[in-house]
């Protein structure tokens, strides 16, 4: 691995990490989730936590933070240790998304609604104990409009630093661009609370049924397409030859609804992040939306800004470290929308994300390293 670029060294300690993950002790998770489900995840964690392998990895994490992944990683569950990990990695602030328990908190059941509230109370307190350095975002179950709006009001008043919303199905059986949801977006805008969608929002890793937004699992029912490490700590998502390549489809559909449905026009200061879907899809989407807007203009449907301009202003996405950010910018522009992430402590984030992204940003230009690692991400860290 090449040495850290001088421009990256200059921003060390200021870096904003737009995708980290929060683990929970299995007993804490069981208390929060209750009857909502996820028992297999809890059982799996209980079998691992406290084993010789876990204890050895935890000890290693104190001196080799980047290499240890999963619940054994430094600060995976503990807010004080997470701050130590951030200092070690040169990161100023980090957004934390749930490691597991995605689908279970978003189904249309009373148990899911109760679990969602308990989770939100937990992460608001956790974030305070991390001195606001590590910001664990709340989750909003959007199967019922009135409940979703009431819970959003509640967590905003509690001091939520962001909210994660589902993107596998239309919220409360209608488009997120429907005027019915305007009060929801207005509250986010007025409170300066970022909204996020995240890979796995349909619970593909924790549900037997298909993710409604993605191709049926039968398409990947082949030995050569199955997950690479389904049982490895930190590899809970279906990382493999198929899933990661199609997982961005949910983000494309949701973002298309918001842009073409006028949500960012009605709420110009709304902050929105599409997290861990990668970034290679964003430039082509912008091109398609701009072309379609030009066609619509010929029949009297007009947008004050180009769709790509709304995206550059309001939306941030997290490239994977294997994606050539410099090439994407050369081809499509949209440089403002790309932000840094580690995926820590998930294994997909790798051990050298700062160096790898630094090599790419250096090829873009002298100023882009600071933009990518710090300035672009400020939209998601009000």
Model-assigned labels for residue ranges:
Residues 112-126, 228-229:
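Active-site-proximal gating segment of KS-fold condensing enzymes and close homologs
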Residues 72-80, 115-121, 146, 173-186:
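Aromatic- and glycine-enriched glycan-recognition loops and surfaces
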Residues 65-74, 83-106, 133-139, 161-165:
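Divalent metal-dependent hydrolysis catalytic cores, especially in the metallo-beta-lactamase
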Residues 23-26, 94-96, 102-107, 144-148, ...:
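Short catalytic/ligand-binding loop motif for oxyanion handling, primarily in non-cytosolic enzymes
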Residues 128, 133, 140, 152, ...:
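Catalytic pocket-lining loop regions of alpha/beta-barrel enzymes
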Residues 2-16, 25-93, 121-129, 150-153, ...:
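Mid-to-C-terminal alpha-helical segments outside catalytic/metal-binding sites
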Residues 60-71, 100-105, 235-244, 354:
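Short glycine/proline-rich turn/loop motifs
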Residues 16-23, 196-199:
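Histidine-centered catalytic micro-motifs
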């Amino acid at each position: 691995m090449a040495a850290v670029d001088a421009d990256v060294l200059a921003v060390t300690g200021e870096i904003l990490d737009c995708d980290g993950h929060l683990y929970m002790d299995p007993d804490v998770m069981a208390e929060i989730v209750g009857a909502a489900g996820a028992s297999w995840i809890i059982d799996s964690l209980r079998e691992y936590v406290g084993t010789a392998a876990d204890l050895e990895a935890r000890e290693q994490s104190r001196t080799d933070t980047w290499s240890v992944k999963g619940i054994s990683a430094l600060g995976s569950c503990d807010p004080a240790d997470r701050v130590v990990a951030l200092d070690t990695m040169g990161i100023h602030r980090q957004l934390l998304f749930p490691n597991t328990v995605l689908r279970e908190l978003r189904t249309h059941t009373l148990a899911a609604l109760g679990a969602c509230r308990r989770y939100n109370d937990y992460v608001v307190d956790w974030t305070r104990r991390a001195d606001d350095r590590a910001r664990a975002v709340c989750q909003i179950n959007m199967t019922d409009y009135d409940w979703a709006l009431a819970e959003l009001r509640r967590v905003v008043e509690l001091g939520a630093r962001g909210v994660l919303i589902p993107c596998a199905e239309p919220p409360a059986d209608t488009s997120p661009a429907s005027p019915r949801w305007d009060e929801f977006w207005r509250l986010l805008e007025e409170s300066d609370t970022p909204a996020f969608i995240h890979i796995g929002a349909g619970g593909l890793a924790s549900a037997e049924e298909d993710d409604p937004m993605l191709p049926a699992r039968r398409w990947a029912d082949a030995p050569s397409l199955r997950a690479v490490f389904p049982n490895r700590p930190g590899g809970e998502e279906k990382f493999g030859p198929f899933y990661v390549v199609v997982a961005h489809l949910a983000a494309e559909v949701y973002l298309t609804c918001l842009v073409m449905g006028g949500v960012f026009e009605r709420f110009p200061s709304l902050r929105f992040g599409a997290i861990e879907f990668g970034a290679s899809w964003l430039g082509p989407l912008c091109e398609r939306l701009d072309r379609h807007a030009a066609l619509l203009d010929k029949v009297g449907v007009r947008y004050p800004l180009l769709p790509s301009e709304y995206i550059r202003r309001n939306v941030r996405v997290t490239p994977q470290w294997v994606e050539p950010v410099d090439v994407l910018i050369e081809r499509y522009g949209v440089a403002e929308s790309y932000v840094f992430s580690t995926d820590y402590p998930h294994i997909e984030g790798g051990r050298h994300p700062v160096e790898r992204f630094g090599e790419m940003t250096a090829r873009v230009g002298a100023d882009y390293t600071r933009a990518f690692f710090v300035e672009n991400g400020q939209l998601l860290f009000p």
